[in-house]
Amino acid sequence: MATPLKLYRNIGIAAHVDAGKTTTTERVLYYTGMSHKIGEVHDGAATMDWMVQEQERGITITSAATTCYWSGMDKQFESHRINIIDTPGHVDFMIEVERSLRVLDGAVVVFDSVAGVEPQSETVWRQANKYGVPRIVFVNKMDRMGANFLRVVSQIKQRLGSTPVVLQLPIGAEEEFKGVIDLIKMKAIQWDEENKGMTFKYVDIPADLKATCEEYRAHIIEAAAEYSEELMEKYLEGEEFTEAEIKKALRHLTITNKVVPVFCGSAFKNKGVQAVLDGVIEYLPSPTDIPDIQGVDEHGDEIHRKTSYDEPFSALAFKIATDPFVGTLTYFRAYSGILKSGDTVYNSVKGKKERIGRLLQMHANSREEIKEVRAGDIAAAVGLKTVTTGDTLCDQDKVVILERMDFPDPVIAVAVEPKTKADQEKMGIALGKLAQEDPSFRVHTDEESGQTIIQGMGELHLEIIVDRMKREFNVEANVGKPQVAYRETLKQAIEQEGKFVRQSGGRGQYGHVWLKIEPQEPGKGYEFINAIVGGVIPKEYIPAVDKGIQEQMQNGVIAGYPVVDVKVTLFDGSFHEVDSSEMAFKIAGSQCFKQGALKAKPVLLEPIMSVEVVTPEDYMGDVMGDLNRRRGLVQGMEDSPAGKIVRAEVPLAEMFGYSTDLRSATQGRATYTMEFCKYAEAPTNIAEAIIKKQ
């Protein structure tokens, strides 16, 4: 029996590394009856963490997609189908989070009640804002020392700039944490310890909490009143709102991203997770609540597809995974229409047809074969050849390209070589497969040294790639020292003439161009403008000039690093009836760009990372001194229950081995996170040293 679309919820559970997200997901699977034994992360048995490295490191790397059903704590709803995408919280895997947010309709963000809003949480929050994903918050670990629910609520307001609406208050905290108060029903909920919180009872609110509950309930009513004029009138006249009115208003305000409902509990102690599941159903959108999906047709015109079974089929591939039993799995989100196994689909980004063999629905690590996938659902297809992350699959007669995801360029590179010569080919295959799964990871061969270079988003990212090569493909590799991905750019505008002329018996070569080369704002990238008028250079040679410039940009002008953020205008030149060719113009363009760029004040850019260190106060001086030595610029400091938080921008080149140094300087008590921030000009002495090395 197919579930109607309004009973679907596609959600992600997102959080900072240790906020307890995987445990929360485990409880969800347990209470919805999908798994019979609770898998604890610290036993290395969590159902969602199915790669061996994840179980060893206790962090989630691949987002597995799982389907479960829920009909409410009091069985008050029809059975809803919830598709959960488990997202990693580690910054080196931010790309996975971004990718899963793209295909979700809503998210549950888990915060640790002790640590509060951590740097990663801010990143996840920003990405959810970018994709307009409605969310609810679960403040977890209320049973831990130092748990403070209301502090987390105020951080959501201040650090994340959102409007939290508290729907529950905790009864007690730390080891005194007993249950939660439902502020809409105005009842306390207590879960039974014997059956891991499977059953619960409503009891009266403890007398000492009544006043606080009244105060927070008033905030809910105030927020709900914003929803409609009728409610506003009721509110101003001091009338009571019904439970249904409050929930309808909050649902609308959550889906339009005006408020964020906040729940609390302890997943580990089996308290509060079912109430969050009710929140998913009551406040997060179904596929029909979200705006139509936008895309472009083959002519580049904008088109819309409704979430409906009657529309032509369209879907977005958001993850490729290699499965030891069935080979390549392509996870995709269907936005419109119906796809049956055996159908042929069109990959509109690559312009290729693919036949769909088997379709699978995933439950963390077990799989069920299905006959069809309908709009709004998430499934995996087996054995698609040409599909990569971000591709659109659609009906070949009704072509649509849903938006491409933008993936950041890698900031760190290392050389790898197999430990034995015999593994050379195996290593190539392994790296190719891993690169297909992960668009933020790149592989290439250095033409000069012949070495294989892998690039990624951070040291941990590349460590895990090397580790997976060993486990999944049986290839052991030696890893070189990390190299920084520098860039070059220009600081001055210049006009330059470039001529490539060869006259030797027979046909010669002739290409002649004038280029205006100018810097762009950081991050704008490369732009080529054809300003040729009157056919002084024939149309067919112009793409060759562009190509020549781009090839030269890839090879750099001062130190061999790619040139970024320049605008080049081709405004004049000449050609020869017989001797001109695409090749001649490509070489002319390339030489002209190099000569011009050398006069346009070229500079070296280095990647700058945003670093956030949390340290006990006693080590504050050492941490600050060390960041200064690493050419760091401190951006700000604040107090937190875990100690002082220092935010700084530090060049990536200075951050290698930082975790070891920080550990020894603070006896292992400080922690840090780091993510790419921007490219900035390297100081002259540093730039000179790098140029010399080249």
Curated annotation (Swiss-Prot):
Residue stretches making up the tr-type G domain: 6-288
GO molecular function, one term: GTPase activity
One cellular component term from this protein's GO annotations in UniProt: cytoplasm
Secretion signal, residue range per the UniProt entry: none
Cross-referenced InterPro entries: EFG_II, EFG_III, EFG_III/V, EFG_IV, EFG_V, EFG_V-like, EFTu-like_2, G_TR_CS
Stored Gene3D superfamilies: 3.30.230.10, 3.30.70.240, Elongation Factor G (Translational Gtpase), domain 3 (3.30.70.870), P-loop containing nucleotide triphosphate hydrolases (3.40.50.300), Translation factors (2.40.30.10)
Subcellular location, record wording: Cytoplasm
CDD domains: EF-G (cd01886), EFG_III (cd16262), EFG_mtEFG1_IV (cd01434), EFG_mtEFG_C (cd03713), EFG_mtEFG_II (cd04088)
Highest taxon in the source lineage: Bacteria
SMART domains: EFG_C (SM00838), EFG_IV (SM00889)
UniProt GO BP: ribosome disassembly
PANTHER family: RIBOSOME-RELEASING FACTOR 2, MITOCHONDRIAL, TRANSLATION ELONGATION FACTOR G-RELATED
Family, as annotated: Belongs to the TRAFAC class translation factor GTPase superfamily. Classic translation factor GTPase family. EF-G/EF-2 subfamily.
Functional note: Catalyzes the GTP-dependent ribosomal translocation step during translation elongation. During this step, the ribosome changes from the pre-translocational (PRE) to the post-translocational (POST) state as the newly formed A-site-bound peptidyl-tRNA and P-site-bound deacylated tRNA move to the P and E sites, respectively. Catalyzes the coordinated movement of the two tRNA molecules, the mRNA and conformational changes in the ribosome.
Protein known as: Elongation factor G
Source organism per UniProt: Legionella pneumophila (strain Lens)
Gene that specifies this protein: fusA
